[in-house]
């Protein structure tokens, strides 16, 4: 796996420098954390800051294969955008299409806590406690929301087993 390019430092919407083919050979988890990520022509791989993990997820590539990626920027602070440095708060990226291996339907991701709410094109599309299913995928695209905590991305059938 070859590392991808360095991400944009734009403080408006943080776009990851990866392409998402219609049918990747393997499906990555949907969450990525601030700081490090690896991009190839097929995948975006998440990296976890200390104490942050996804149940059932494992690092698919050694750290030496990852590329540095600037942390996304806050866009809701009263003093204007300010960029996070280092391993800051996790962020949620929503690549399109939303898919997980062995999911018969679109996966659902439950947001436990947001820094405020997530807005896309002026509309509030996600708020604390919201569940995000397949109908979000075209509307959200790759918009980034800053999260305080999130649950794992799960198949709809697994929702009853979530803590």
Curated annotation (Swiss-Prot):
Protein name: 18 kDa protein
Domain of life the protein comes from: Viruses
Species, as recorded: Abelson murine leukemia virus
